[in-house]
Every structure is written in C-alpha cells, then in structure tokens.
Design a protein with these regions (language model features):
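Charged, amphipathic alpha-helical linker segments immediately N-terminal to NTP-binding catalytic cores
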Residues: 1-5
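Pre-Walker A adenine-sensing motif
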Residues: 9-22
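Walker A/P-loop nucleotide-binding motif
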Residues: 25-46
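Switch/connector loops and helix/strand junctions flanking conserved nucleotide-binding motifs
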Residues: 38-39, 88-89, 168-173
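Post-Walker A helix-loop "phosphate-sensing" segment adjacent to the P-loop in P-loop NTPases
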Residues: 48-65
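Mid-core helix/loop region of P-loop NTP-binding domains shared across ATPases and GTPases
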Residues: 71-75, 83-148, 152, 159-161
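Conserved AAA+ ATPase core "coupling" helix
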Residues: 90-93, 174-184
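Sensor-1/coupling segment of RecA-like P-loop NTPase cores
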Residues: 141, 152-177
Length: 184
C-alpha cells in the first residue's frame, strides 16, 4: 500500500463513525460501492499497514516494535478480512489469534513489562485491550458466521464494524441488526 495518503471528507467521516462505535461499544455497518475508500480508511484507522506484518509473523520482538505497539494502542482496533471460503470455525480461530496478538502488543505499550501479571505457571496473563474489531468484506460471511460475530460482541463487549458492498444492509439476520448502533 502506498505511503501517501490524502485525508478526505469520507475518511474523516469514517474515523468519526469508528470512534463513535468504539466508544459506544455497539455494532456499526459501513457499506458502499467498490473503490470509495472503505478498506483504506479502515486500514488507516486501525494502523494495520504498520501492524499487519508484526501480527502475522508472530515471533521474537525488537526495540523498533515499540512504535507499532503505540500505534495499536491509539485506537485499540483489530482489522480482519475473511477469505472467500471462511467457515465459522476458521473465523473464530482467526479472530481469537488477531485479538490476542493485538492485545499483547497494546499491553506491551501501556504496561511496564515487569508489571504484567503472571499466572500460576509463570506465563504472562493478557487482558483484552482490543475495543473494536473491523471486519472487511463481511458480505463473504455466512449467516452462521455473522451470528458468531454477534455472539462475540455480546459476550466480550467488543465493538464491531462490518464493512461491505451494497446489499449487506439487507441481510436477514434480525438479531444482528437489533444490536446495530450506526450505519455509514
């Protein structure tokens, strides 16, 4: 992705929308035709271009990673793009991995390393620092996968934004739409 980014009125609108959904811990829906900047705005909001490689290639850390930890801590947001054939099980596993890894990075930024609590086996205990999950290309998800997202929202109280093409708002999942907090 290009280093150059122009902040447009639509990007500012997305940022305000995402901030509102995150603060209110609600479910938001963002849809529109291809090419209007939904994905680019979401990636920018979540600092995903900086963090994606670190979160994907999980392993030893270096001192330069502190900048990425700080960026992730700013909006406490994880971005997920499901594959075309994503099953509910794969969705659950992917979200668990992304949220856990993002939380660990945020924890590294907000807490002193010697202050992170240990469990009884001596490993670090990680709290959930992620406040918002953005799901791009959400029209790819089955009704069962959408129900899994809604269940996760209910249990973990993590705000959720679904991004997709026009028609996403016409989905038949009434339970999901009853929890909806905003549309952009």
């Amino acid at each position: 992705m290009s280093e150059r980014f122009i902040v447009t009125k639509e990007h500012r609108r997305f940022t305000e929308f995402a901030d509102s959904v995150r603060r209110g811990r609600t479910i938001g829906l963002c849809f529109g035709p291809a090419g209007v900047g939904k994905t680019v705005s979401a990636r920018r909001y979540a600092h995903w271009d900086q963090a994606h490689e670190l979160l994907t290639d999980w392993g030893p850390r270096c001192d330069d990673d502190a900048k990425i930890y700080a960026a992730l801590a700013k909006n406490r947001t994880a971005l997920y793009t499901p594959g075309v054939l994503t099953t509910p099980r794969l969705l659950r596993e992917d979200l668990d991995r992304i949220i856990t890894r993002t939380s660990i990075c945020i924890q590294q930024h907000v807490e002193a390393p010697d202050r992170i609590p240990l469990d009884r086996w001596g490993t670090r205990r990680t709290s959930n620092y992620v406040q918002l999950v953005i799901v791009d290309e959400s029209e790819r998800l089955s009704p069962t996968a959408l129900e899994l997202l809604r269940d996760r929202y209910d249990r973990d109280q993590i705000a959720l934004i679904l991004i997709g093409m026009p028609g996403l708002e016409k989905s038949n999942d009434q339970n999901l739409w009853m929890a909806l907090g905003g549309v952009t």
